[in-house]
A protein has these predicted regions:
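Charge-dense, helix-prone N-terminal extensions
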Residues: 1-118
Length: 118
C-alpha cells in the first residue's frame, strides 16, 4: 500500500480530516467528537516501510503484537492503547481496514466508555 492509497482509505471515514500538528513528518488523521478533534491514526511521512499508528483495545493490542512482527507498541504514544503497524504486507488489506475502522470507532465512541459517578 502506498501513502496516497492509505491517505484515501483514512479520509473515506465520515468527518475525518488530515492535519500536521507535529510538523511535516507526521500526518495526523482526526475526527470531530463533540467539537473536539480526536486522533485516530498517525502516519510517518518519511521512510519505508510506512508506519501507521492506530488506537486499539488494550487486549487486542497485545494479541496483535504477539501474532505479527510488524505490529509494535505505539511509537511516542500510550503503549497500552496504541499500536504502530509497519506496512510490510504481513497484514492482509481487509485486516488493516478493520483495524483502521476499530481505531476510528474507539475514538468516536469513547464517551460511551467513560465511567460516570453517581
Amino acid at each position: 500500500m502506498t501513502r496516497p492509497e492509505l491517505e484515501k482509505l483514512l479520509l473515506q471515514l465520515p468527518n475525518s480530516k488530515l492535519d500536521y500538528p507535529f510538523g511535516e513528518e507526521v500526518a495526523v488523521y482526526k475526527v470531530d467528537v463533540d467539537g473536539e478533534q480526536k486522533m485516530f491514526a498517525l502516519v510517518q511521512e518519511q521512510g519505508e516501510p510506512i508506519r501507521l499508528s492506530l488506537k486499539c483495545d488494550p487486549q487486542l493490542a497485545v494479541l496483535l503484537r504477539e501474532k505479527y512482527e510488524s505490529v509494535l507498541e505505539g511509537y511516542h504514544l500510550n503503549k497500552k492503547h496504541w499500536n504502530t503497524i509497519l506496512l510490510t504486507g504481513q497484514l492482509e488489506l481487509d485486516e488493516l481496514q478493520g483495524l483502521i475502522l476499530h481505531s476510528y470507532n474507539l475514538v468516536i465512541d469513547n464517551k460511551a466508555h467513560v465511567p460516570t459517578t453517581d
